Amino acid sequence: MPREVPLERIRNIGIIAHIDAGKTTTTERILFYTGRTYKLGEVHEGTAVMDWMEQERERGITITAAATTAEWTVEGVPYRINIIDTPGHVDFTAEVERSLRVLDGGVVVFDAVAGVEPQSETVWRQADKYHVPRICFVNKMDRIGANFERTVEMIRERLGAKPVPIQFPIGSEDRFRGIVDLITNKAVLYVDDQGKREELDAIPTEIADEVERLRNEMIEAIAETDDELMLLYLEGEELSVEELRRALRKATIKGQLVPVLCGAALRNKGVQRLLDAIVHYLPSPVDIPPVRGTRPGQVAGDDGVEMITRPTSEDAPFTGLVFKIVSDPFVGKLAYFRVYSGKLETGSYVLNSTRNQRERIGRLLQMHANHREEIKEVYAGDIAAMVGPKQSYTGDTICDPNDPIVLESIRFPEPVIQLAIEPKTKADQDKMAVALSKLAEEDPTFRVFTDQETGQTIIAGMGELHLEVIVDRMRREYKVEANQGKPQVAYRESITVPADVDSKFVRQTGGKGQYGHVKLQVEPLERGKGFEFINAIVGGVIPREYIPAVEAGVKEAMASGVIAGYPVVDLKVTLYDGSYHEVDSSEMAFKIAASMGLKEAVRKGRPILLEPVMKVEIVTPEDFLGTVLGDINSRRGHVEGMEARGNAQVIRAYVPLASMFGYTTDLRSATQGRATSSMEFAYYQPLPEALAKEIVEKRRG
């Protein structure tokens, strides 16, 4: 069966933004206009289609990225838009990160009142990292304090982008009644409540001068990206709508310009024009560079490793990337994946090249938030879900077994907060283990491990809300009741000076003994660099087959910690010498020798504890500024900058996570509920010595 929609007419887009900018509402409106839903869903009523987990409907936020397919017709031509709705809450950045990896373009939604908020900056940086072309939608134009020009200015200043407004609002706040389309130079007024009826009208005289200025600026910005248009423009020629659209599309895909639109999704204003803009300016799978990868077992960037490219075409061998695992109450495990090349039919086999496992494709589904449609095959450019994968996890490559390739995986931040959790009853015990392992499969930033010293089960994640949602899902979806401890900071250990160690593990009991001997040089790496292992053995003083055991021993010792039982990070370990015994040496002996060696090296290397520091943004009325600043200082924080926003002050600061637990509640009571704050992980920094001493003593009991 040939594909229904040609590749050029497919758009894989994400709707990304700060929490509460109105992203899910915008997606809901898109689904309504593209005929996928017949009744409008509202987040604040708890009926939004894309928010299908109970927690999302209760909290009014989006936690998981639901993928859905919609159809939209522009000038008589049908297009298919695959939409991924992503969460805006900072505790769920993993969801945003993994969606961006498989998208071709993004719609970034801003709140016209608040403008660019901290999470908008985070999301923007994530989109930059994956070179995702984007358009901006300034939402909530009907709210008191809405300001389109200020938001555009903030996009320019705080995000360092080159925004080009291609629309201008007619009226704002409760008088927002339409937009001027600067490309066609026509006014569009909304006549009915559902925004389905538009009337074209003359541009209102009170904004005519402003519109003319903005239109000229827009034409100039577009012409600057295209030499042919620049010549026509300089010669005073009138540029046609087609020429402007074509050049703006090119510039958007290259990342030179960012078109900006406006509207009020909740009032159904501006969403159809946004759909047109998705088609006009965002790339199809054909417009982006072909995906690149390596052969299994090779590492990109190593000497002599050639990169393989896969063209976006169904004639190429099949290549896909799994970007999300979901435990579905009806069909079990679902793996969402993006097809980069080739095609895939149900009943066929693929190779999971990341894990070197074959996987049979049972059923394929195309998703519409939470109802699904069975399909027989998927093609290059599609996003679909397979049912019941045995071996595939987030970030894995699936490909044609006869032509294997491994794509770059998705990298996720390490968890910064942890808490102990225990089942309430004996019956909950086994159920809890199953629930936690399923939840960890779905979410790569959520970890579960057992504390070696206390035997407690510890869960770790990106923030208090993240862990709260996990415990909540355990209760609802898996019917597990659990008691939880207080949130704890996920400290790390590291060293400050290099250390050399000579470590021997020898055991002689009757019969075969044990013998492992390694010499290690251990050096500190800069923050965030993780772990590097270098094998510098020459002349076979340690046989090659024991080297992986040495690395495993080092990693094991690092994971369990040395001075206070926290994982050791940012180390470079070089194995440069050692010896072995013909009979007594074994992998186990070398593993133990390496593990003992690493622990000794950390003790010698002037060890320190590292603590996570959060980037905090607080919006407070002027009257409480002194109180809020004093409070930040008392929490060992330092203020990086302040700016006025309307009659409020915005404070940006860095504060250690250890002193931020329950901060939102404290802030509310200190400011009579008038200040708001948001925070996200920034970096790890050394803990002051007195505090470190206290923690080490406490851990050692």
Curated annotation (Swiss-Prot):
The keyword ATP-binding does not apply. One of its GO terms (cellular component) is cytoplasm. The keyword Nucleotide-binding applies. GO terms for biological process: ribosome disassembly. GO terms for molecular function: GTP binding; GTPase activity; translation elongation factor activity. CDD domains: EF-G, EFG_III, EFG_mtEFG1_IV, EFG_mtEFG_C, EFG_mtEFG_II. Keywords: Cytoplasm, Elongation factor, GTP-binding, Nucleotide-binding, Protein biosynthesis. It is found in: Cytoplasm. GTP binds at residues 17-24, 85-89, 139-142. Its main location: cytoplasm. NCBIfam families: EF-G, PRK12740.1-3, PRK12740.1-5, PRK13351.1-1, small_GTP. HAMAP family: EF_G_EF_2_B. Catalyzes the GTP-dependent ribosomal translocation step during translation elongation. During this step, the ribosome changes from the pre-translocational (PRE) to the post-translocational (POST) state as the newly formed A-site-bound peptidyl-tRNA and P-site-bound deacylated tRNA move to the P and E sites, respectively. Catalyzes the coordinated movement of the two tRNA molecules, the mRNA and conformational changes in the ribosome. Belongs to the TRAFAC class translation factor GTPase superfamily. Classic translation factor GTPase family. EF-G/EF-2 subfamily. This is Elongation factor G. The gene is fusA.
